[in-house]
Amino acid sequence: MSLADTIRSSLVPIHREGYRFIAAFGIGSVILGLLWEPLFWIGLLLTAWCAYFFRDPQRITPVDDRLVIAPADGIVSSVGPALPPPELGLSGEFTRVSVFMNVFSCHINRAPVRGRISLIEHRPGKFLNADLDKASMENERNSLIIESPYGPVAVVQIAGLIARRIVCWAEAPGEISVGERFGLIRFGSRVDVYLPREARPRVAVGQVSVGGETIIAEFGSNAPPPLVRVS
């Protein structure tokens, strides 16, 4: 592999949603630099951070209907039974896996399963810290129901304290593949996945999640949730 190919393969693509933000940071840096040169370098660092925030790396997604894949990068903040948002019309408790994204996480959201999108519902709300449990019901959110081979799976994008703009380009009705990009949330947020109770979690609270790659749950398995060790 040539040096040019090595450099090219090391560069992570930037999602189009970030272009105008990066341009604004760049123009602002130049203007501030005209006033005082050190401000230009500070602005340049912020521009680089903005570009890093909107990165859109390729992911290697396991393709198996039994597997549920992480919807986002971040930290698993909760795993356990919970009621889905009422606007989804899903009755009873589901198994919820929540992934919290901080401002340094890649904020592209991906489908955890394949299937038909039967519903997309946006609800206004508060902008509490997305890491709080009550944010699931009180914060602004955008929800999808995916009719998977093992039943309905709900994916909820939740706005956070800083992130106040949810983007979803999926459409209902429509088909979606596991690991497929369907949206993003700007500047720190959370994604909840609600699974039928027969799904067995394969992650623990505090575990690092890689969107489109980490297996967070499995259907058709009687194995208990994994034991974990912090070391």
From Swiss-Prot:
In alphabetical order, the GO MF annotations are: phosphatidylserine decarboxylase activity
Q: Could you list this entry's UniProt keywords, alphabetically sorted.
A: Cell membrane, Decarboxylase, Lipid biosynthesis, Lipid metabolism, Lyase, Membrane, Phospholipid biosynthesis, Phospholipid metabolism, Pyruvate, Zymogen
Q: Which residues catalyse the reaction?
A: S189 (schiff-base intermediate with substrate)
PTM characteristics: Is synthesized initially as an inactive proenzyme. Formation of the active enzyme involves a self-maturation process in which the active site pyruvoyl group is generated from an internal serine residue via an autocatalytic post-translational modification. Two non-identical subunits are generated from the proenzyme in this reaction, and the pyruvate is formed at the N-terminus of the alpha chain, which is derived from the carboxyl end of the proenzyme.
Bilayer topology annotation: Peripheral membrane protein
User: What residues bear Pyruvic acid (Ser) in this entry?
Assistant: S189
Subcellular location field: Cell membrane
GO BP term (any one):
phosphatidylethanolamine biosynthetic process
Where along the sequence do coiled-coil regions lie? Answer: none
* Cofactors, names only: pyruvate
PANTHER family associated with the record: ARCHAETIDYLSERINE DECARBOXYLASE PROENZYME-RELATED
* Protein name, as recorded: Phosphatidylserine decarboxylase proenzyme
